[in-house]
């Protein structure tokens, strides 16, 4: 008796060039840092930034064009992967650019920080090209484990270690829920391949309680990673307790990676049973809009305020998924990318006003910023206006597009609800500007600090928010093309 074995197909490694490059360079950065003196830590930083620039270029070269699947169907190369990875690399570059002065001032400028960041970004890129449940989980855990370590990076800070422990425990529970959901999906469908899961879901998924239970657990696990209410409880403590640079990092690229997670699992894997998971996403979106905005109103710590406002922005991103259309998914991606840019600038201003022994964490620390630095006050105005959704900024287009996506599918009540809470959310953003422009600086307020490079980066960030608001077409077109939709 002869047993036939399937023919081995050599994987196309060229499709995974961004991940291979990131993996190799993360190891190179570690080795270079190992043999570098403290006075030459800048070399590690420059090498990290070079790695991300090349990774973004490789993502376009490797993925833009016809879709392809390799590594036995576990890895997909398509336009969506290209856009996601360019956004992840770009936001990672921006996050590291903001962190150098902060880390150097506090004696934390070590190669391990950049290595952890690169491995975290590698996990996000793996998620962006995942075509298999195990590949999704592999990328997600690589992201999560490195973020836990980054939160606790300042080991002498008790708040940071406490926040890292909370994040780790809650993250482990969420990972277990997600993995259990994936195992139920595998038990129902007999496959880990997302394309095969979609075929089964289309044929009899709506009547298979095992698949529906697995779907429910997967949504819960993904909602935690995204920071959607009521699975957002880790965010305020992590944002407040972690070094500000880590809070900046966690609020930017991982949100784009969460969009990748939603798209690959819910759209591609469980898309045929959209009617079953849509009500869950509606509940998550509504809860995020309500709790995120109302809780942010009561905050005096600006990092906690930004954490709760992140939950409200997640609610807006979820509106795009509720639509269940390619246009809706593309607007969610556009929102996540633009939110990452806005959030980086907001945390960047906190970093600018902070120095060794003083963290500008309270909203009152921004009193009289206009008197101390009119240029930085203007950047704060642009960022807060954009987060509010004032016309002329990119935040307005992001909100308008996701709201339009739910109107297009007949959920007008949800669109009105989102607009109402967007107006409520404007209060705490405008309150920050009240401190910046109308309050006098306290006598013991520290002077506006930061290197010329740091101030230049903030100016560029603010201008980007303004220019993307005036000329949003290129970014919108790229997000639409990622889902095969033409814009215009």
Curated annotation (Swiss-Prot):
GO terms for cellular component: plasma membrane. One of its GO terms (molecular function) is NADH:ubiquinone reductase (non-electrogenic) activity. NDH-1 shuttles electrons from NADH, via FMN and iron-sulfur (Fe-S) centers, to quinones in the respiratory chain. The immediate electron acceptor for the enzyme in this species is believed to be ubiquinone. Couples the redox reaction to proton translocation (for every two electrons transferred, four hydrogen ions are translocated across the cytoplasmic membrane), and thus conserves the redox energy in a proton gradient. Its main location: membrane. It is an enzyme of class 7 (translocase). InterPro entries: NADH-Q_OxRdtase_suN/2, ND/Mrp_TM. PANTHER family: NADH DEHYDROGENASE. Pfam families: Proton_antipo_M. It comes from the Bacteria. Coiled coil: none annotated. It is found in: Cell inner membrane. The keyword Membrane applies. Keywords: Cell inner membrane, Cell membrane, Membrane, NAD, Quinone, Translocase, Transmembrane, Transmembrane helix, Transport, Ubiquinone. It catalyses: a quinone + NADH + 5 H(+)(in) = a quinol + NAD(+) + 4 H(+)(out). GO terms for biological process: ATP synthesis coupled electron transport. This is NADH-quinone oxidoreductase subunit N. The chain crosses the membrane at residues 15-35, 42-62, 79-99, 108-128, 133-153, 168-188, 209-229, 243-263, 277-297, 305-325, 333-353, 376-396, 409-429, 456-476.
């Amino acid at each position: 008796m002869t047993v036939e074995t399937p023919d081995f197909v050599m994987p196309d490694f060229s499709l995974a060039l961004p991940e291979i490059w990131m993996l190799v360079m993360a190891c190179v950065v570690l080795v270079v840092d190992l043999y570098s003196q403290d006075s030459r830590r800048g070399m590690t930083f420059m090498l990290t930034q070079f790695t991300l620039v090349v990774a973004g270029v490789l993502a376009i070269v490797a993925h833009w064009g016809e879709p392809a699947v390799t590594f036995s169907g576990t890895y997909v190369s398509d336009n969506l992967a290209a856009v996601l990875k360019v956004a992840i690399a770009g936001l990672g570059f921006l996050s590291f650019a903001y962190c150098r002065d902060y880390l150097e001032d506090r004696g934390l400028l070590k190669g391990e920080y950049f290595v952890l960041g690169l491995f975290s970004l590698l996990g996000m890129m793996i998620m962006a090209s995942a075509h298999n449940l195990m590949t999704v989980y592999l990328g997600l855990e690589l992201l999560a484990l490195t973020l836990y370590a980054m939160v606790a990076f300042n080991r002498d800070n008790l708040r940071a270690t406490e926040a890292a422990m909370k994040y780790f425990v809650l993250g482990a529970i969420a990972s277990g829920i997600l993995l259990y959901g994936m195992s139920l999906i595998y038990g129902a469908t007999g496959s880990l391949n997302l394309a095969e899961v979609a075929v089964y879901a289309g044929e009899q998924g709506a009547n298979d309680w095992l698949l529906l239970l697995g779907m429910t657990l997967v949504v819960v696990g993904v909602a935690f990673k995204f920071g959607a209410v009521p699975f957002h409880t880790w965010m305020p403590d992590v944002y407040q307790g972690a070094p500000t640079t880590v809070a900046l990092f966690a609020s930017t690229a991982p949100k784009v990676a969460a969009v990748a997670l939603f798209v690959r699992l819910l759209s591609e894997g469980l898309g045929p049973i959209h009617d079953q998971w849509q009500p869950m996403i509606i509940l998550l979106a509504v809860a995020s809009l309500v709790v995120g905005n109302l809780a942010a109103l009561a905050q005096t710590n600006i990092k906690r305020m930004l954490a709760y406002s992140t939950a409200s922005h997640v609610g807006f991103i979820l509106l795009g998924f509720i639509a269940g259309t390619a246009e809706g998914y593309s607007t969610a991606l556009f929102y996540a990318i633009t939110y990452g840019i806005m959030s980086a600038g907001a945390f960047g201003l906190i970093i600018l006003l902070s120095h060794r022994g003083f963290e500008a964490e309270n909203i009152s620390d921004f009193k009289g910023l206009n008197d101390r630095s009119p240029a930085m006050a203007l950047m704060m105005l642009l960022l807060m206006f954009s987060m509010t959704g004032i016309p002329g900024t990119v935040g307005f287009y992001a909100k308008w597009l996701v709201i339009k996506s739910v109107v297009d599918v007949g959920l007008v009540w949800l669109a009105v609800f989102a607009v109402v809470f967007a107006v409520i959310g404007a209060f705490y953003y405008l309150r920050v500007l009240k401190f910046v422009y109308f309050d006098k600086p306290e006598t013991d307020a520290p002077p506006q600090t930061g290197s010329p490079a740091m101030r230049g980066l903030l100016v560029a960030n603010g201008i980007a928010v303004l220019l993307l608001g005036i000329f949003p077409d290129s970014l919108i077109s790229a997000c639409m093309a990622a889902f095969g939709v033409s814009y215009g």
